[in-house]
């Protein structure tokens, strides 16, 4: 049996690993990097930034724990972002190794579903057609842009942009009080921004 999976995020690679362990011949098609939104612009990067924010926030409460002295700690954004990149790179390498161990064939490119059993993949080298008995579509998500507030990646940022800032903004307005918005609000407030959340 052959299976093609479109999307190498948590849904896609989990399905690929389970199918491969069951003896299925798996082709996993990924447009960019294994790990998807969760690994590259979601759960893992935000938790990594948040751990830095937690440490910085805790440092302001040292006296509560009987630790005194003078210290002026601040967020070093290039170092924080570099740490985040190392964490995601390490986890991505782990996924690549697991694919190799389980003999999951990974094809990097843009997938097009031609029929229920045929996927056309446009890669840097050209076009490849992958035929299989079944296809799983696990294509993930991307940040929503509001027509009234276009992202310019300078003053108006996407949540992805907020994970790569090289300096702490003096103030920040976050549109959206969901999980991502509130998490970014906590992170940047801990780093020293004056944060307003609009919901």
Predicted regions and their residues:
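Conserved acidic residues
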Residues: 9, 110-112, 178
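Glycine-rich flavin
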Residues: 17-24, 29-168
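N-terminal Rossmann-like FAD-binding beta1-loop-alpha1 element of flavoenzymes
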Residues: 2-27, 181-190
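Conserved N-terminal Rossmann-fold NAD(P)-binding element of oxidoreductases
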Residues: 6-7, 29, 137, 175-176
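Rossmann-like NAD(P)H-binding beta-loop-alpha module
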Residues: 166-199
């Amino acid at each position: 049996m052959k299976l093609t999976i479109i999307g190498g995020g948590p849904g896609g690679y989990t399905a690929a690993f389970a199918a491969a362990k069951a003896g299925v011949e798996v082709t996993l098609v990924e447009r960019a990097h294994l790990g998807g939104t969760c690994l590259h612009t979601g759960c893992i990067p935000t938790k990594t930034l948040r751990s830095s924010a937690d440490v910085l926030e805790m440092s302001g409460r040292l006296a509560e724990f009987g630790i005194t002295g003078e210290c002026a700690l601040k967020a070093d954004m290039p170092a924080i972002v570099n740490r985040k990149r190392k964490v995601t790179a390490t986890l991505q390498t782990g996924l690549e190794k697991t694919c190799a161990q389980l003999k999951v064939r990974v094809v990097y490119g843009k997938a097009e579903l031609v029929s229920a059993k045929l996927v056309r993949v446009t890669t840097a080298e050209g076009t490849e057609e992958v035929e299989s008995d079944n296809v799983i579509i696990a294509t993930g998500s991307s940040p929503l842009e509001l027509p009234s507030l276009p992202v310019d990646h300078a003053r108006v940022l996407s949540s992805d942009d907020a994970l790569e800032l090289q300096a702490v903004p003096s103030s920040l307005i976050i549109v959206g009080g969901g999980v991502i918005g509130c998490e970014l609000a906590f992170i940047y407030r801990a780093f020293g921004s004056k944060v307003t959340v609009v919901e």
